[in-house]
Amino acid sequence: MIVPIRHQETLANLNFPHAQAAEFLKNSEAKFFYFLSPQRREKDRLEARARMFFYGGEDPATGSAAGCAASWMVQHGIANSDEQVLIRQGVEIRRPSEMYVRATRDGERVTNVRVGGYAVELLRGTVTI
């Protein structure tokens, strides 16, 4: 479920009620909450901050939710069709991530949703079963 937040300071200071959220989600088709705060920056660049809470934790980068957010922003006129949007996530948990998203509007439909970014290897190992 995409939850728009007007002010990025509010998003940064969000105290997520995990137990209440789990109860709400049980009666919903949504699986998680993706909090999104889009803001226009200089030169009309659209950037957003996001937070994704799940199972008592927080994800530093959620590409699948970022793609849905791109579609949502285009559908609701926040982002223009094919406009690249930078989504920053994971800042509050000291694992900052940047994802670049865009989506195309085709009449009333949103299509061609794209998510990209860079990744770094955090761990390498072998598991023996």
Enumerate the predicted regions with their spans.
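Active-site proximal loop and beta-alpha junction motif in alpha/beta enzyme cores
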Residues: M1-I129
